């Protein structure tokens, strides 16, 4: 699963996702993409599950790019532990996804295959998404 090799600090503030995505809103690599419509934290497990669903449907033909990276450590305290005594340990890694952010890109497959593969991948994610494609020049 995806996670940073090393970080400057072990734990981060929770933070909020305000407004729309500042960058990463256009297709850079593939001809088709999956774009987020609402703000949410997407975990490394969800990203991996979506990637597996997409590649499995494409039968390993074509190419997949993951445009988001889980660099936010999410902490949690063990169950039945009283409040206080410091922040919990890092439980999992997540990526903050703002509306308009392209999360996955595909290339080398027909449009109907790409559309269905991204639909299956989107089912693994906790947010509403939209299928986008490169405009023919």
From Swiss-Prot:
GO terms for biological process: translation. Signal peptide: none annotated. GO terms for cellular component: cytosolic large ribosomal subunit. GO terms for molecular function: rRNA binding; structural constituent of ribosome; tRNA binding. Keywords: Ribonucleoprotein, Ribosomal protein, RNA-binding, rRNA-binding, tRNA-binding. SUPFAM superfamilies: Ribosomal protein L16p/L10e. InterPro entries: Ribosomal_uL16, Ribosomal_uL16_bact-type, Ribosomal_uL16_CS, Ribosomal_uL16_dom, Ribosomal_uL16_sf. It comes from the Bacteria. Pfam families: Ribosomal_L16. Belongs to the universal ribosomal protein uL16 family. PANTHER family: 50S/60S RIBOSOMAL PROTEIN L16, LARGE RIBOSOMAL SUBUNIT PROTEIN UL16M. Part of the 50S ribosomal subunit. Binds 23S rRNA and is also seen to make contacts with the A and possibly P site tRNAs. NCBIfam families: rplP_bact. This is Large ribosomal subunit protein uL16. It comes from Bartonella tribocorum (strain CIP 105476 / IBS 506). The gene is rplP.
């Amino acid at each position: 699963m995806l996670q940073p090799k090393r970080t400057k600090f072990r734990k981060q503030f929770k933070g909020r996702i305000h407004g729309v995505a500042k960058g990463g809103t256009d297709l850079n690599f593939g001809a088709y993409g999956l774009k987020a419509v609402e703000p949410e934290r997407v975990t490394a497990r969800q990203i991996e599950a979506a990637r597996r669903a997409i590649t499995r449907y494409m039968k390993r033909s074509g190419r997949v790019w993951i445009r988001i990276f889980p660099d936010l450590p999410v902490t949690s305290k063990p169950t039945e532990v009283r409040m206080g005594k410091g922040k919990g340990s890092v439980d999992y890694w997540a990526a903050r996804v703002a509306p308009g952010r392209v999360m996955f890109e595909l290339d080398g497959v027909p449009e109907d295959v790409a559309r269905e593969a991204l639909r299956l991948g989107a089912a693994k994610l906790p947010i509403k998404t939209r299928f986008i494609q490169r405009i023919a020049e």
